[in-house]
Swiss-Prot record:
GO molecular function term, any single one: hormone activity
Organism from which the protein derives: Tenebrio molitor (Yellow mealworm beetle)
Main location: secreted
Keyword Transmembrane helix: no
Cellular component GO terms held in the UniProt record: extracellular region
Domain of life: Eukaryota
Name of the protein: Diuretic hormone 2
Length: 47
């Protein structure tokens, strides 16, 4: 039972790390998308 409890704890730690990483990746993707949109707008305005 002790070993099971330990693996469960490490599993939850891994899960929270995954959640954090996914949130970070989403944030980066959102920033890139916003920057890309701004760049496209500037290109259109400069034509």
């Amino acid at each position: 039972a002790g070993a099971l409890g330990e693996s469960g704890a490490s599993l939850s730690i891994v899960n929270s790390l995954d959640v954090l990483r996914n949130r970070l990746l989403l944030e980066i993707a959102r920033k890139k998308a916003k920057e890309g949109a701004n760049r496209n707008r500037q290109i259109l305005l400069s034509l």
